[in-house]
């Protein structure tokens, strides 16, 4: 029995040492062998795109353009912003990005008085800032890339006047009463319809860049002012909300002019509910914004404004063509600024929204 017990004990010791022997051999056998795969290189630069609402499909298209441009140069763009428009949170994200030492910032200058100090502080701290979609021209930002929002409003007003025969009672829903781009669009629209005595804006409401609020405000306008027979939505979500309300009420007599060519907007145009929309170039804004930050890093001189084209896209045109892309510039009947400065682009690395925003 004793020899057998000794054999069992020996076997147990051998078994217990087998993992150590195996992994020790593995370590010895690979110590001079190069790894089969290479570590991903660090990005050449780290920019951030800070939007007013990361859930807005329009800003997803802007981000896609920025991400494609960054990838073409071996860099990265992080997409940040509140989940619902909130200027205070937006500004905090700019401040946090500056503190984190990012290489550049693309952001809106939603309200110039509010955003100018934080943009100026970023520049003073050595972080280049390019405004996108909405400018803050009196700030120290390096450049602006985006639509000429006043001209886009003028174009919208002229088109509505022409389409309605110069006679309409108009309800307007704008994304914000404070945002510079929204104020510019509304001012352009008002100036364009002023020569037409039969055109009158009955009331203006704000959706605060919220689909739910846009629906509520549209319903309010139609309930309070039954004479309204035309609607203008000045931000991307307003027109689709108007279409939903008007369609639900069976009001085929209401002329709707929207802003941007989101897939839902295009679908309502196919159904004949939205008559036309003002088309922007969000992808190009994002792409060219990154290109401008890279040019600034090379100490190249930048112009103050780089306007991207805007144009009217009609329901008739949509119905005569194939499916539209999601939010890309769809082409249209008239560019407001065909001679705008163009940058030239070559095109996608990304991190998801809200990574640095504990507030959401």
Give the positions of each predicted feature.
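An alpha-beta-alpha
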Residues: 47, 156-196, 203-204, 293, ...
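Short beta-strand elements in bilobed, periplasmic/extracellular small-molecule ligand-binding domains
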Residues: 71-86, 169-172, 193-212
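Flexible loop/hinge segments that line or gate small-molecule binding clefts
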Residues: 114-151, 262-270
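Hydrophobic alpha-helical segments within soluble ligand-binding/sensing domains
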Residues: 145-169, 213-215, 265, 280-298
């Amino acid at each position: 029995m004793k020899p057998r017990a000794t054999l069992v004990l020996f076997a147990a010791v051998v078994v217990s040492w087998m993992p150590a022997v195996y992994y020790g051999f593995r370590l010895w056998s690979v110590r001079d062998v190069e790894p089969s795969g290479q570590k991903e290189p660090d990005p050449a630069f780290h920019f951030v795109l800070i939007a007013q609402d990361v859930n807005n499909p329009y800003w997803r298209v802007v981000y896609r353009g920025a991400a494609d441009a960054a990838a073409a140069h071996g860099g990265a763009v992080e997409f940040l912003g509140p989940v619902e428009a909130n200027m205070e949170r937006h500004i905090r994200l700019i401040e946090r990005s500056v503190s984190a030492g990012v290489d550049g910032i693309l952001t809106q200058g939603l309200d110039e008085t509010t955003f100018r100090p934080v943009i100026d502080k970023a520049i003073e701290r050595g972080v280049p800032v390019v405004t996108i979609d909405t400018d803050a021209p009196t700030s120290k930002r390096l450049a602006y890339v985006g639509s000429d929002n006043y001209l886009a409003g003028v174009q919208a007003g002229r088109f509505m006047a022409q389409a309605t025969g110069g006679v309409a009672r108009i309800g307007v829903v704008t994304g914000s009463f404070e945002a510079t781009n929204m104020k510019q669009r509304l001012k352009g629209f008002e100036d364009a319809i002023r020569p037409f005595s039969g055109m009158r804006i009955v009331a203006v409401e704000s959706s605060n860049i919220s689909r739910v609020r846009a629906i509520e405000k549209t319903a309010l306008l139609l309930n309070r002012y039954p004479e309204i027979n035309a609607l203008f939505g000045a931000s991307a979500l307003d027109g689709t909300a108007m279409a939903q309300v008007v369609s639900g009420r069976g009001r085929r007599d209401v002329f709707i002019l929207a802003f941007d060519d989101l897939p839902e907007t295009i679908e309502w145009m196919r159904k004949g509910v939205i008559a036309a929309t003002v088309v922007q170039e969000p992808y190009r804004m994002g792409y060219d914004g990154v290109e401008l930050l890279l040019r600034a890093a090379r100490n190249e001189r930048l112009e103050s404004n780089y306007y991207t084209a805007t144009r009217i896209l009609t329901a008739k045109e949509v119905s005569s063509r194939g499916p539209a892309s999601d939010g890309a510039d769809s082409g249209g009947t008239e560019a407001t600024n065909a001679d705008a400065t163009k940058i030239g682009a070559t095109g996608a690395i990304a991190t998801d929204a809200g990574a640095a925003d504990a507030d959401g």
